[in-house]
Amino acid sequence: LYVNSGSSALYIGMEASNFPEGGEVITPALTFSTTIGCIVKSKLIPVFIDVGFNDYCIDVQAIEKNITSRTVAIVAPNLMGNICNWEKISEIAKKHNLKVIEDSADTIGGTLNGKLSGSYCDWTITSFYGSHIINCAGNGGMLCMNDEKMINDAKLLRSWGRSSSIFDAKSEAIENR
């Protein structure tokens, strides 16, 4: 789903996830402000953990000891071209029935053990801002998921609740322009 920025992709994805108010979201302390902003705006509680000294990615050894009965998700960015240990994060999330959200703004097209960035998570975002791998002369972002209901909810959020126009249902969708 194309949106105006990677930040908007995070906000829309978090809103479309319908997490229960007061749920906890594990995230690294070293991240862009949007990661925290979308958690707080969705009335969730960020649980900060440290990052690895050499890769600046979420410290997978610290995740499990920070999981509580209120934890609903893990949100982690790949940072400065370094990809998180998504295999371990995914394994922990499955064990505890948590959603995994990847911010791949810095690593679109990157691979981990032959699998593309974004393959281990429930949904991912990327940004096309000028400082990222692929840019589009200013801004732009994308939300990627494999959940039809959630993508339909996200489309409604992107279009301020409109699902059709005076012409037809497809006339307002940016993908059809």
List the predicted regions and their residue ranges.
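Aromatic/hydrophobic pocket-lining residues that form π-stacking "cages" and hydrophobic walls in ligand
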Residues: T35, I89, A154
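Proline-centered loop/turn at the N-terminus of a beta-strand
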Residues: E24, I45, V72-A73, N97-K99, ...
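Hydrophobic/aromatic ligand-binding patch that stacks against planar heteroaromatic rings
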Residues: G37-I39, I92, I133
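Hydrophobic residues in well-ordered beta-strands that form the structural core
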Residues: E21, T27, F48, V100-E102, ...
